[in-house]
């Protein structure tokens, strides 16, 4: 696996852990789901925080680049989990965000 593929997979796993960690409390608070879902939510958010420490860049650069990946993964979640069709504006926004992420993440290293 190339370094770029490893970093992309790490970004995607980080985003998924954050989304699950936030979605489960949303289900409890908005959809009346059982409170025990807060336990896996907390574990997922702890996993999210730990995964952030595995990224090779400085924290601020990691967070900035991660934002683009988060947007793309959140839109995939919207389509797959929530069953909402993506608009062309959703796709355009994700492409722009991923472009910004690529500029940050793929910059020449000094």
UniProtKB/Swiss-Prot annotation:
InterPro entries, alphabetized: UPF0060
Main localisation: membrane
PANTHER family cross-referenced by the UniProt entry: UPF0060 MEMBRANE PROTEIN YNFA
Cellular compartment(s): Cell inner membrane
GO cellular component term of the entry, any: plasma membrane
This protein's UniProt keywords: Cell inner membrane, Cell membrane, Membrane, Transmembrane, Transmembrane helix
Record membrane topology: Multi-pass membrane protein
SUPFAM superfamilies per UniProt: Multidrug resistance efflux transporter EmrE
Matching HAMAP family: UPF0060
Family: Belongs to the UPF0060 family.
Protein name: UPF0060 membrane protein Bcen2424_1283
One Pfam family, short name: UPF0060
Residue stretches spanning the membrane: 9-29, 34-54, 66-86, 88-108
Organism encoding this protein: Burkholderia cenocepacia (strain HI2424)
């Amino acid at each position: 696996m190339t370094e770029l593929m490893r970093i992309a997979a790490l970004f995607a796993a980080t985003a998924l852990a954050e989304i699950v960690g936030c979605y489960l409390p949303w289900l409890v608070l908005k959809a009346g789901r059982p409170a025990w879902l807060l336990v896996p939510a907390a574990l997922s958010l702890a996993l999210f925080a730990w995964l952030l420490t595995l990224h090779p860049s400085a924290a601020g650069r990691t967070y900035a680049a991660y934002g683009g990946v988060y947007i793309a993964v959140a839109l995939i979640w919207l389509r797959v989990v929530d069953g909402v069709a993506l608009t062309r504006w959703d796709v355009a926004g994700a492409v722009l965000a991923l472009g910004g992420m690529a500029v940050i993440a793929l910059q020449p290293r000094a």
